[in-house]
Amino acid sequence: MTTTINADTSVGGAIVTGDTSGQLGLQADGTTLLTVAGDAVTFNKGISETIYNLSGTALDPANGTIQTKTLSAGVTLSDSLSSGESLVLMLNGGVTYSVIFPPMTWVTSSGNAAPTLTANDTIVFWKINTTLYGAYVGSYT
């Protein structure tokens, strides 16, 4: 279904702007929040991401692109990312409990090797086509 929005349409205090070149904008209180031109989206204000406390084992960005997990036992994580998706995982307790990662390619200076976890770790996951990638960002206190 295609919906046509006319330029300078106001909905709930937000204004949608457009021009003949196909550029689309979203304004609130007279400030442009984002602009869509061709295949580029420009954000003029901050982006707020959902933070999710991962209680299960599925790495799924639909729950939030920043996730936290505190381990109370060993865990086997599973891949629920689609191509083009990514997420950040802040993991607590990896030095105490075993963590088994899904099949993936680790991006490291020493080659395709999973990190040695500490008490508190940050890892970024992303998927291109069918390949899951991971990069160890580092530990935190």
Task: State the predicted function of each range.
Residues 42-105, 119-120, 124-141:
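Exposed extracellular interaction/assembly regions and N-terminal maturation sites
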Residues 17-19, 82, 116-118:
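Short coil/turn motifs at beta-sheet boundaries
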Residues 2-44, 139-140:
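Beta-strand-rich receptor-binding modules of extracellular spikes/adhesins
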